[in-house]
Curated annotation (Swiss-Prot):
It catalyses: 5-amino-1-(5-phospho-D-ribosyl)imidazole-4-carboxylate + L-aspartate + ATP = (2S)-2-[5-amino-1-(5-phospho-beta-D-ribosyl)imidazole-4-carboxamido]succinate + ADP + phosphate + 2 H(+). Its EC number is 6.3.2.6. Pfam families: SAICAR_synt. One of its GO terms (molecular function) is ATP binding. It comes from Wolbachia pipientis wMel. Belongs to the SAICAR synthetase family. This is Phosphoribosylaminoimidazole-succinocarboxamide synthase. PANTHER family: MULTIFUNCTIONAL PROTEIN ADE2, SI:DKEY-6E2.2.
Length: 240
C-alpha cells in the first residue's frame, strides 16, 4: 500500500503517499519541540503513545458523527488517513486560562472561562503562527463565512465531547488545538485533520492540577513519556 515516499514532514509527524491518491499514511515521530523549535528532543516511544491516543479519540469522534480524516490504525506508529488540503489555521478552543492566553491578557493561570473561547492562528512557522481574526480569514479566503461557522460549530462540539471524555478519566481539558482540511476529491467537504493527543491538548489532573501534556516538556516539569502514558492509562487506551 505504501510507496515509501514522504510527501510532507512536520515537527511530530510525516505523511507518506500510498497507491490510492485519496489516502495517505500518517506516521507519528518521537520528536518533541517547543517554542517554535527552539527546544527539541527525541523521546523514545512518544509517537507510539500519541498514535494510539489519537486513534482512540478520532474513533470516538466519528461515532459522535464528527467527520475526520482517520480511517484506521496500521501499526504502532502509523494510521491510514484521508488525504487533505490542509487549511492553514490552528483552531484553539479554551476552557481554562493557560499558556499564551494568560500572557496576552495578564490573567492568572487556572481561571475557568464562563464559556469556551475559540482563537484562530495562521499556521506559519516563519511568522511564529500569528493570531488572526475572522476578518483576516475571510480576506485571505482560507474559509468562507459559511465554512467558518461550520468550523466553529464543529470545534465546540468536539470540545464538548472531549471535555466529557477526559472528565471521566479525572482530567481537565484545559485547551485544545485543532486543524481542519478539505478532502482532495471533494473540496467542499471540510473534516478534522492532524491528531488529538497530549501534544496538542492541555490536560490537568482534576485533583492535583498536575500537567499531563507537552507543558511537562516546555516547562521542565518531569518525565513527558510518563505523563503521556498516564493519559493513555486513564482513557483505557491499549498501546499494543
Amino acid at each position: 500500500m505504501s510507496l515509501n515516499k514522504t510527501i510532507y514532514e512536520g515537527k511530530a509527524k510525516a505523511i507518506i503517499e500510498t497507491e490510492d491518491l485519496s489516502i495517505v499514511i500518517q506516521h507519528f515521530k518521537d520528536d518533541v519541540t517547543a517554542f517554535n523549535k527552539e527546544k527539541y528532543e527525541i523521546i523514545d516511544g512518544k509517537g507510539i503513545i500519541n498514535n494510539h491516543i489519537s486513534a482512540f479519540i478520532m474513533e470516538k469522534l466519528e461515532k459522535a458523527e464528527i467527520s475526520t480524516h482517520f480511517i484506521k490504525t496500521l501499526n504502532e506508529r502509523e494510521q491510514l488517513v484521508k488525504k487533505l488540503k490542509i487549511i492553514p489555521l490552528e483552531v484553539v478552543v479554551r476552557n481554562v486560562a493557560a499558556g499564551s492566553f494568560c500572557k496576552r491578557f495578564n490573567i492568572k493561570e487556572g481561571e475557568r472561562l464562563a464559556s469556551p473561547i475559540i482563537d484562530f492562528f495562521y499556521k506559519n512557522d516563519d511568522l511564529a503562527d500569528p493570531m488572526v481574526s475572522e476578518n483576516h480569514i475571510l480576506y485571505f479566503d482560507w474559509l468562507s463565512s459559511k465554512e467558518m461557522d461550520e468550523v466553529k460549530t464543529t470545534t465546540l462540539k468536539i470540545n464538548e465531547i472531549l471535555v466529557h471524555l477526559f472528565s471521566n478519566a479525572s482530567i481537565y481539558l484545559v485547551d485544545l488545538k485543532l486543524e481542519f482540511g478539505r478532502l482532495i476529491n471533494d473540496s467542499t467537504k471540510i473534516v478534522l485533520a492532524d491528531e488529538i493527543s497530549p501534544d496538542n491538548c492541555r490536560l490537568w489532573d482534576k485533583n492535583t492540577y498536575k500537567k499531563l501534556d507537552k507543558d511537562v516538556f516546555r516547562l521542565n516539569l518531569g518525565d513527558l513519556k510518563e505523563a503521556y502514558l498516564e493519559v493513555a492509562k486513564r482513557l483505557s487506551v491499549k498501546l499494543g
